[in-house]
Amino acid sequence: MLPAHKQTLEALLADSVAQVAHALKGADAEFVIPAITLERPKVAAHGDVACNVAMQLAKPLGTNPRQLAERIVAALVAQPAAQGLVDAAEIAGPGFINLRVSAAAKQAVIAAVFEQGRAFGTSQREKGKRVLVEFVSANPTGPLHVGHGRQAALGDVLANVIASQGYAVHREFYYNDAGVQIANLAISTQARARGLKPGDAGWPEAAYNGEYIADIARDYLNGATVAAKDGEPVTGARDIENLDAIRKFAVAYLRHEQDMDLQAFGVKFDQYYLESSLYSEGRVEKTVDALVKAGMTYEQDGALWLRTTDEGDDKDRVMRKSDGTYTYFVPDVAYHVTKWERGFTKVINIQGSDHHGTIARVRAGLQGLHIGIPKGYPDYVLHKMVTVMRDGQEVKLSKRAGSYVTVRDLIEWSGGAAPGQEAAPDMIDEATITRGRDAVRFFLISRKADTEFVFDIDLALKQNDENPVYYVQYAHARICSVLNELKARYNVDVAQLPGADLSQLTSPQAVSLMQKLAEYPDLLTHAANELAPHAVAFYLRDLAGEFHSFYNAERVLVDDEAPRNARAALLAATRQVLENGLAMLGVSAPAKM
């Protein structure tokens, strides 16, 4: 049922409940009518939608729930506006109200899809509101790994879903370009520039071992110029002793590499925010000073502590260590102050589950500033790790990174690149990248964020129903093929299909497919409200399944014009919703496979 019809029916039910309640208690009686929520029953035989309002109100109204349900139904069907929406109403069990929606109401989804096209499912209900979604936020110390890939998929799709509700969404990447890890990157590159390699005497213990460090050192010594998308070009100084120059070059080099990873993955950001700018602009010091003045800190053992227990943390936390350096959550607090000051009253951070411990500290710091930031700010979506499998074995290493599998490895392997071919990116064609990107994005969004994910390369390469992205894309391609055949054989023009006689769509499979199409708008609203982008992938698999069931049961290429065009209209609407949903995931919708 379309949201507009559902809202109308819920309003009619609420009016019916009020009528019955006043009849039982008197016109002047005061009572609270609970929100009417219609749900699709788990068993199709129980009707199209159901609600339990009679059981909720039976006790307050002093009556039997089943008898109350009967009176509510009688009041409902007596309303003229309900007669075009409801075919039948039944009472089940102790007082459930089960409603069967009219055929016309079910068929209305097809016209809605044709009318709205790519906008079908979206809403402007949150227009004028702004949301910042921060995700990936990797250290510029190496290529993006598969955990970053999961975060990129979650963040990008969630941003799309939230934008579908009318929000103005700002995508942001926070670069942790300050601290010990950046220092380790510099000494790693310096060691490579000196001709050392992992395992050699003199190789720094904390150095990074990936082959990419050798590439950075080579380009630095060759005087190459590199730049991130939002950064100034940096040219290799060729001076092995100039550690600061090496650091700047290495950071710029890896930021550029990460830009290329994100481009291959189809992810774009509106802004890159540098942690180093928080120090250079004095924001960290300013935040700490404000917390001191607010009485949220105390000194002990030469360190400055934040009273995080005041905000629910299990113990107070050190902000500034005895050596004068800050602990890692302090710049996070300063960074979130900038988000608030930029006008983002709703902020969502996508992070690995290993960041769970920082949530209370960041929120405590923000509350301690007393600048109007609400409790629970920001929101978090935490994801668990990804394990990569191939040939039944876990893949732990890659030539690129040395100690982990990179996003680019995963994209290329999932697109069909042979092991070892990833070492020569110029050998990877665009079709391979597209196939790989589609598989990786769909797979990584196909589970709830808080569950561990096993990425099976062999499954991603399968071209059958076992592969979920293939299953959904094949449904889209199959419909495109049928519509082309209808054009060739019967001169059926898709643009004319909205005029088809939809009363022909009476089979259980057709009705079920129409109901699934009508769920898409509510599905997007739910996914946005619950920060649950995986719900879109779940829905698309279900929709593809409903299509296959319908197509196997109903012949579309028939000579009889009325049923042919009606079924073709249903297929065309299904194709559009599949395309819309795949676009929400950042996955292509091929017309041929």
Swiss-Prot record:
Signal peptide: none annotated. It is an enzyme of class 6 (ligase). Coiled coil: none annotated. It is found in: Cytoplasm. PROSITE patterns: AA_TRNA_LIGASE_I. It catalyses: tRNA(Arg) + L-arginine + ATP = L-arginyl-tRNA(Arg) + AMP + diphosphate. One of its GO terms (biological process) is arginyl-tRNA aminoacylation. SMART domains: Arg_tRNA_synt_N, DALR_1. Keywords: Aminoacyl-tRNA synthetase, ATP-binding, Cytoplasm, Ligase, Nucleotide-binding, Protein biosynthesis. One of its GO terms (cellular component) is cytoplasm. Its EC number is 6.1.1.19. It comes from the Bacteria. InterPro entries: aa-tRNA-synth_I_CS, Arg-tRNA-ligase, Arg-tRNA-synth_N, Arg-tRNA-synth_N_sf, ArgRS_core, DALR_anticod-bd, Rossmann-like_a/b/a_fold, tRNAsynth_Ia_anticodon-bd. GO terms for molecular function: arginine-tRNA ligase activity; ATP binding. A motif ('HIGH' region) lies at residues 138-148. It holds the Pfam family DALR_1. NCBIfam families: argS (TIGR00456). Monomer. Belongs to the class-I aminoacyl-tRNA synthetase family. This is Arginine--tRNA ligase. It comes from Burkholderia vietnamiensis (strain G4 / LMG 22486).
